[in-house]
Every structure is written in C-alpha cells, then in structure tokens.
C-alpha cells in the first residue's frame, strides 16, 4: 500500500527537538493508544543565524554486492541551508530551511541468464514488438527536495501566533516493483509532492492557564506511472 495523506517530512537542520512518549499521551495528540514521536521545529530568534551542511558518498568507496560480486554504482550527495532571525525584534521571527538529496544508484535484477533467454525467445516467437528483458543492474535515480518556512509572532503579553509551511518533493525512476526476480520493465516511477500548512495560536489566560488553537491542512499529489509502457512486465516466482 501507499500513504493516503500528506506527511510532513522535515529537513535535518530544521529539527529542534524530538519528544518520544511511549504511553499516556496528552489529549492534544488525539486518540493514539500507543506511543508517538513529536517533532518540534526551530524558530527564529533576535539574532540572525544560518547554517550550511553537505554530505557526499562516492561510488568508488562502496563495497562489493553479495549477489553481483561488484560494487553497485551508488553516489549520494546531500546538502542544505537554514536561516533564522528577527523580522521585528522581540515580536516577529522568521526561520527557513532547504535541503536536497541527489542519489544516483542502481538496483540488481537476479533473474538467471537462462530464464532471460527463455523469456526473450518466447517474446520472439510471438512476434512481440517491444523491448526484451535483461538481468543485472538497472538505473534507479532518486531526487528529494524539502523546504520549510516558519513565522512566529508574539503579541503584547504572552500570546503567540505561529504559521509553518512545509513541502517535500520526491522524484525517482524504476522505484517500485523492479529488482530480484522482477524485470525493470515491471516497475513504476514515483513523482510525489506533499504540502503541509500548520497554524497555532496560544492565548495566556493566567500564569497557570493557557489555551491553544491549532489547525493543519495537508495535500499530497502522488503519481506512480509505469516506468516502461512497452516492455513486458516479467516477474518470476
């Protein structure tokens, strides 16, 4: 199955704190009977501050795959930036974060060469006009983008309003259904974009009492078109 709702996936540098509750959650977290993880995002402060980071994994440093006996051509680069600070000192604060991952990788089809030859011979016999199947490596590139923008505003007193927008974009080819005993022509691509908007207003009624109103809207646009419209969908069991 696949997800049926937009899930906020955050960049590494936008996370301020993790809260892990194994049981006995408060009412604000709904009717969850088990444990849950609450992720708190960063906010701007009265000082402008930014970060840059980068990560690179090169295919020449990979170990050999146990099935193919050769190193899979995996190259991954991941980088991002964040910036936060005051729009109006002591009142309004901005925080923003961007992250991207570029992953050039390959999957492995382990169909025996004799089975590949038998399937292709059958396709030839019936006059199939599409491409033939193959074994070995197939391309599986992945691109991920994440963006977060957050504004906090403090009213006079201790009241506070927060609005946050987050988008997460995924692009991948031959993402689902290929590998092992399934040919690459049996796979589907993945084009997915999630949008999430969260707003909250905290009203301080007394030194011991607060009231919070919170709302969220999520939208997910998930597409999984076939990777190969003309190739045979071969899966051996």
List the predicted regions and their residue ranges.
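Short, small-residue-biased leader/transition segments that mark boundaries at the very start
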Residues: 1-7
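Outer-envelope beta-barrel architecture signal
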Residues: 14, 44-48, 77, 90-94, ...
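Membrane-embedded beta-strand positions of outer-membrane beta-barrel proteins
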Residues: 50-54, 83, 96, 163, ...
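A beta-strand signature from Gram-negative outer-membrane beta-barrel systems
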Residues: 10-55, 63, 78-91
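Transmembrane beta-strands of outer-membrane beta-barrel pores
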Residues: 24, 54-60, 69, 100-104, ...
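Short sequence motifs at beta-strands and strand-loop junctions characteristic
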Residues: 29-31, 72-76, 139-143, 155, ...
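Hydrophobic, lipid-facing positions within transmembrane beta-strands of outer-membrane proteins
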Residues: 33-35, 77-81, 145-149, 193-199, ...
